[in-house]
């Protein structure tokens, strides 16, 4: 009898030590998956497009929610650090566009490739880098993903080729990466992203032509957030049907605020490229909450009411949250716990990013050359000992 009472006491004391919300979540039975209807994509030169229904598992839903919430909180922390003058220089935030970076990653393989423009923080995270490495790069510290030398626009990870500062210049590079995939006989694709502001660049159309001519496994992706700096798409383009811009290249127009739409469209586009049919073009209709960059308040060319309307009706995190709660894939309490954990992760990363030392002056020339080639090959001044170390 005493042993039984002791065992019961241990069980009850263990429950008492846990927060009530955790006990409630642990005892609740959730659905393993749910089927959702998603918006049909507009098609160009395609007879069939991505499915209009999709299955979301509880595991994937929780993962997507955590990732989008992490990107959102990371960008808000970057905004705070910039206003405190801890982050300097160019800084472009992507809050509001989380469904794009998380949804694209959900539709490809880790071995696939991705290159984008300067609004790159979210993609850097979804490609596998930690919040610590990203925030430390923003603050110019040694622990940053580019050793503190790249900043906001020049971050890199495995199979992620940046952050590129020149408008539209990454698109021919993306076609080149796709060429390498085909040349090496690899079943890989390259996601090549650019914004609506870059969509009128001539080099993009040249890349279209070469990719179609050589049937490269390249997914050209226009992130249409409706404004190129402060210019609306209607004032910048004679045709705002960016998914048709490839002309001879098939295209999709996708709801870029819905992570499930983005995921299914990406899977469809990747399968198209892997089949050897050549490139395909995706237009993601999305929206950024911040201005173009930190120097742009974002309300001189659009109203606060417009921004608030998008937040209230189309926010990608809220859309996923509502779906999961209403389909018994998760509870409000469980998602709140994730929010708390994400905030703590961001705060810890921010402390690291402000306490980590800056790179010393003697390391200014490090990481320029690969495999430490001799001076006569690199053509450098003999008295400047540039080094290449990893």
Curated annotation (Swiss-Prot):
Residues holding pyruvate: 92, 118-119, 157, 165, 167, 196-198, 225, 227
Family annotation (SUPFAM superfamilies): Thiamin diphosphate-binding fold (THDP-binding) (SSF52518)
GO cellular component assignments: mitochondrial matrix; nucleolus; pyruvate dehydrogenase complex
Regulation of its function: Pyruvate dehydrogenase activity is inhibited by phosphorylation of PDHA1; it is reactivated by dephosphorylation.
Sequence positions bearing Phosphotyrosine: 301
Enzyme class, UniProt record, top EC level: oxidoreductase
Subcellular location as annotated: Mitochondrion matrix
CDD domains reported for this sequence: TPP_E1_PDC_ADC_BCADC
Described purpose of this protein according to its UniProt entry: The pyruvate dehydrogenase complex catalyzes the overall conversion of pyruvate to acetyl-CoA and CO(2), and thereby links the glycolytic pathway to the tricarboxylic cycle.
Name this polypeptide is given: Pyruvate dehydrogenase E1 component subunit alpha, somatic form, mitochondrial
Organism: Bos taurus
Lineage of the species this protein comes from: Eukaryota, Metazoa, Chordata, Craniata, Vertebrata
């Amino acid at each position: 009898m005493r042993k039984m009472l002791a065992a019961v006491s241990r069980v009850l004391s263990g429950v008492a030590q846990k927060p009530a919300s955790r006990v409630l979540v642990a005892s609740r039975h959730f659905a393993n998956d749910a089927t959702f209807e998603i918006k049909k994509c507009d098609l160009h030169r395609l007879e069939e497009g991505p499915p209009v229904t999709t299955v979301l598992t509880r595991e994937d839903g929780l993962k997507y929610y955590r990732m989008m919430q992490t990107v959102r909180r990371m960008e808000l922390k970057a905004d705070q650090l910039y206003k405190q003058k801890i982050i300097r220089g160019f800084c472009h935030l992507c809050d509001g566009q989380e469904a794009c970076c998380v949804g694209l990653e959900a539709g490809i393989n880790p071995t696939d490739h991705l290159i984008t423009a300067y609004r790159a923080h979210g993609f850097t995270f979804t490609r596998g880098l930690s919040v610590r490495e990203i925030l430390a790069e923003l603050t110019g510290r040694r622990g940053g993903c580019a050793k503190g030398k790249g900043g906001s626009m020049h971050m890199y990870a495995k199979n992620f080729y940046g952050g590129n500062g020149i408008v539209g210049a990454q698109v021919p590079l993306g076609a080149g990466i796709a060429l390498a995939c085909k040349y090496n006989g690899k079943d890989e694709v390259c996601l090549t992203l650019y914004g609506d502001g870059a969509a009128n660049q001539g080099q993009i159309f040249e890349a279209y032509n070469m990719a179609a001519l050589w049937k490269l496994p390249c997914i050209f992706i226009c992130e249409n957030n409706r404004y190129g700096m402060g210019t609306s798409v209607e004032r910048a383009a004679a045709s705002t049907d960016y998914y048709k811009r490839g002309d001879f290249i098939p295209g999709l127009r996708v709801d870029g605020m819905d992570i499930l739409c983005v995921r299914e469209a990406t899977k469809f586009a990747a399968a198209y490229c892997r089949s050897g049919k050549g490139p395909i073009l995706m237009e993601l209709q999305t929206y950024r909450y911040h201005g173009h960059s930190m120097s742009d308040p974002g309300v001189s060319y659009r109203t606060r009411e417009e921004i608030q309307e998008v937040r209230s009706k189309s926010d990608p995190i809220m859309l996923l949250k509502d779906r999961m709660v209403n389909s018994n894939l998760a509870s409000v309490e469980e998602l709140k716990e994730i929010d708390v954990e994400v905030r703590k992760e961001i705060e810890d990363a921010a402390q690291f990013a402000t306490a980590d030392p800056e790179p010393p002056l003697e390391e200014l020339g490090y990481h320029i050359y690969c495999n430490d080639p001799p001076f006569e090959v690199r053509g450098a001044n003999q008295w400047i000992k540039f080094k290449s170390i990893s």
